[in-house]
């Protein structure tokens, strides 16, 4: 039995869940999310809990059991509280600016980077060097933050680039030089 998969998911007030033909829809105060549930896993909806169980003990069913439970829990959390990831931009002249749903990044290249934000993702820019990526889909929030970071990842000598707010950069010493 999966240690994560066997835990029931509490459904908060204001969240509606519908499960039809292996499609799960979760609606809440922040929006709605849908996902197709993998084969080999079944879902039991009771009054205010969701229980995930597997049909057999095959390798596919065992691996999908805990994953399905975690994905459903992330959907419920997303439509109630949402998810956010903080990014920091370090470097002279490095800045971010939001125009509509396009994030303009100036990261030391000869050209500005215009990043089109996906639907369902909001970005808040604070002092042109701090970004807060918000949304209800945890996977999409993390993926968007990773794409923004990938434009100019932090370098180990001066720490310039885009990094996660809680990320520590291992710094290297430069060349000592010949005297």
Curated annotation (Swiss-Prot):
Quaternary organization: Part of the 50S ribosomal subunit.
Any single Pfam family the record assigns to this protein: Ribosomal_L6
Example of a GO cellular component annotation carried by this entry: cytosolic large ribosomal subunit
Function: This protein binds to the 23S rRNA, and is important in its secondary structure. It is located near the subunit interface in the base of the L7/L12 stalk, and near the tRNA binding site of the peptidyltransferase center.
InterPro entries with a match to the protein in the record: Ribosomal_uL6-like, Ribosomal_uL6-like_a/b-dom_sf, Ribosomal_uL6_a/b-dom, Ribosomal_uL6_bac-type, Ribosomal_uL6_CS
Recorded name of the encoding gene: rplF
GO biological process annotation, one example: cytoplasmic translation
Record NCBIfam families: L6_bact (TIGR03654)
Protein name as it appears in the record: Large ribosomal subunit protein uL6
Organism, as annotated: Geotalea uraniireducens (strain Rf4) (Geobacter uraniireducens)
HAMAP family in UniProt: Ribosomal_uL6_B
Cited Gene3D superfamilies: Ribosomal protein L6, alpha-beta domain
GO molecular function: rRNA binding; structural constituent of ribosome
Transmembrane regions listed in the UniProt entry: none
Keywords attached to this entry: Ribonucleoprotein, Ribosomal protein, RNA-binding, rRNA-binding
């Amino acid at each position: 039995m999966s240690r994560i998969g066997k835990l029931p998911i509490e459904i908060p007030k204001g969240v509606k869940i519908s499960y039809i033909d292996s499609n799960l829809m979760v609606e809440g105060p922040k929006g709605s999310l849908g996902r197709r549930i993998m084969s080999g896993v079944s879902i039991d909806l009771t009054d205010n809990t969701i229980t995930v169980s597997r049909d057999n003990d095959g390798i596919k069913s065992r691996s999908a059991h805990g994953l399905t439970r975690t994905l459903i829990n992330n959907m419920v959390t997303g439509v109630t509280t949402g998810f956010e990831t903080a990014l920091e931009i370090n470097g002279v002249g490095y800045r971010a600016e939001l125009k509509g749903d396009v994030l303009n990044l100036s990261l030391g290249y000869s050209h500005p980077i215009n990043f089109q934000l996906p639907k369902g993702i909001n970005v808040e820019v604070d002092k042109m060097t701090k970004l807060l990526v918000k949304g209800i889909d945890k996977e999409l929030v993390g993926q968007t933050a990773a794409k923004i970071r990938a434009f100019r990842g932090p370098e180990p000598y001066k720490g310039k680039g885009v990094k996660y707010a809680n990320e520590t950069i291992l710094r290297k010493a430069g060349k000592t030089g010949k005297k």
